[in-house]
């Protein structure tokens, strides 16, 4: 059977999808090899969220063809969906598969290889034998993602991680932030049936996974495309209509309904949720989440800017004060929750005054972690044609200021644990400065280390350890003195 090398770029949704694709190929008998080795087929699951991500996608595709010019190079995902013309003209790409067709990867590959064999048989002595199949993109491999209401059902049985499994619960986004190309790459909101999610998580629990993370493109919109009456009957039936595509669905309680069902699954001890819109955090949803002991107090609330004028240009549908209220609600019902966020610097029109407002707001909120991004112009978005584009050197300076602020806030949050007890799910063994440690995370996702030499007999991966935090191993990792281990 042919050998296949896979490479993934981008978000946790992409990571989930490439693991499913690898699983499907293995079930079909393909041999999986590392991407830096010679393979018959190279598959790159691409990303296009920023210019750099798209460039890296192209680089990996070109690297594959350079590694083995005779190999079949397959581009999959978001870059294919948004860069159709570039993909068609790229001589390094033999086959392109868009989003919502990843579940059909194996069958598409088999059909392509059959066509290739027939072409080679006809042109056995011809100069162009070997890659004569027309790769022009068409609806069989790249669908019109903007006009599909069908969720692409895939199920993951195992994952590369030993303790934590990412579970995809929805795809697509209806928000159309002015800087973002993702709605065009992923299409409108399409939610996964709750029954399929529960079945997959139950299977993961039986396979020994103790922690799951719900992920998606815009998980705050989970369930907004379901028929209300069917949902009340316990059914997940999608009824998305063309004229409803751009409605604002944030604040849906169906995500909380789903969390409550997952909470009842035996064997799952920790539940995490991916990036949330701040508007989904209301008094009701916060109170309901607080009633779920398995739900980890770690919330990623996407901010992007602390300046209201910038938020309006971004088409973010909240104010900085509304964001602050959402954080306050979470801190009211959870004890010292970890709040993380994303911030974009150098958005078109961002003045020094607006940037100062953002800094002041970040200082006011105090985050556990902040992901700082320099604005990246994406073709086809409204922000790409806005006036007053910010020069790159200014973006770099502002990014540096926020990264320094992030480092201070993050260490301050971790320092809260000093002298306190913590519960850690151990995940891996790693050497740090010549010493071997077992590493894991607290419920609020602070990384903690346990010395392996002193506790090797008791401490193994996928074990829960409780103990007292004694200090820092480094700026990002706390040192735990174990008191109790439990399977």
Give the location of each predicted region.
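Short flexible coil/turn linkers enriched for glycine and charged/polar residues
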Residues: 160-163, 173-174, 295, 305, ...
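Hydrophobic, well-ordered secondary-structure elements that form the walls
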Residues: 301, 342, 362, 370, ...
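Contiguous mid-protein beta-loop-alpha structural module that forms a pocket-lining wall or clamp
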Residues: 350, 364-367
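Aromatic/acidic polysaccharide-binding cleft in carbohydrate-active enzymes
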Residues: 374-388
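Terminal RNA-binding accessory module
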Residues: 126-129, 385-487
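Proteins enriched for Cys/Gly/acidic motifs involved in redox and nucleic-acid/cofactor modification
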Residues: 1-222, 229, 236, 254, ...
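Conserved SAM/AdoMet-binding glycine-rich loop
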Residues: 73-74, 82, 206-352
């Amino acid at each position: 059977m042919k050998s296949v090398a896979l490479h993934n770029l981008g978000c946790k949704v992409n990571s989930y999808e490439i693991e499913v694709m690898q699983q499907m190929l293995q079930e079909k008998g393909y041999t999986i090899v590392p991407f830096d080795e010679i393979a018959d087929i190279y598959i790159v699951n691409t990303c296009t969220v920023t210019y750099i991500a798209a460039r890296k996608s192209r680089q990996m595709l070109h690297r594959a063809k350079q590694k083995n010019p005779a190999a079949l190079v397959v581009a999959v995902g978001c870059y294919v969906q948004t860069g159709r013309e570039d993909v068609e003209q790229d001589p390094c790409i033999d086959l392109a598969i868009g989003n919502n067709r990843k579940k059909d990867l194996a069958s598409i590959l088999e059909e392509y290889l059959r066509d290739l064999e027939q072409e080679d048989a006809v042109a056995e002595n011809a100069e162009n034998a070997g890659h004569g199949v027309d790769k022009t993109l068409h609806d069989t491999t790249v669908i019109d993602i903007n006009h599909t209401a069908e969720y692409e059902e895939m199920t993951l049985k195992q994952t590369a991680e030993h303790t934590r499994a990412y579970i995809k619960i929805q795809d697509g986004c209806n928000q159309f932030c002015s800087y973002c190309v993702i709605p065009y790459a992923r299409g409108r909101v399409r939610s996964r049936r709750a029954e399929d999610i529960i079945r997959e998580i139950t299977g993961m629990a039986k396979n020994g996974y103790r922690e799951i993370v719900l992920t998606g493109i815009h998980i705050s919109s989970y369930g907004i495309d379901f028929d209300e009456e069917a949902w009340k009957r316990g059914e997940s039936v999608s009824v998305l209509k063309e004229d409803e595509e751009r409605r604002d669905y944030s604040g849906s309680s169906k995500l909380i309904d789903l969390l409550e069902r997952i909470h009842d699954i035996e064997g799952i001890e920790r539940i995490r949720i991916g990036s949330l819109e701040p508007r989904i955090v209301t008094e009701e949803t916060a109170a309901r989440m607080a009633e779920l002991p398995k739900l980890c107090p770690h919330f990623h609330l996407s901010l992007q800017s602390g300046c209201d004028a910038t938020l309006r240009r971004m088409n973010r549908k909240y104010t900085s004060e509304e964001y602050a209220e959402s954080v306050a609600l979470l801190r009211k019902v959870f004890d010292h929750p970890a709040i993380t966020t994303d911030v974009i610097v150098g958005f078109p029109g961002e003045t020094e005054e607006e940037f100062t407002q953002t800094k002041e707001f970040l200082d006011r909120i105090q985050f556990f972690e902040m992901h700082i991004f320099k604005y990246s112009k994406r073709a086809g978005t409204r922000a790409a044609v806005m006036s007053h584009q910010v020069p790159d050197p200014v973006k770099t300076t502002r990014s540096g200021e926020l990264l320094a602020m992030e480092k201070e806030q993050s260490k301050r949050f971790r320092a809260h644990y000093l002298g306190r007890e913590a519960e850690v799910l151990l995940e891996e063994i790693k050497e740090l400065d010549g010493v071997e440690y077992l590493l894991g995370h607290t419920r609020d996702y602070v990384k903690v280390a346990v010395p392996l030499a002193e506790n090797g007999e008791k401490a193994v991966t996928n074990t829960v350890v409780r103990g007292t935090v004694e200090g820092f191993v480094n700026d990002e990792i706390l040192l735990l003195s174990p008191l109790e281990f439990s399977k």
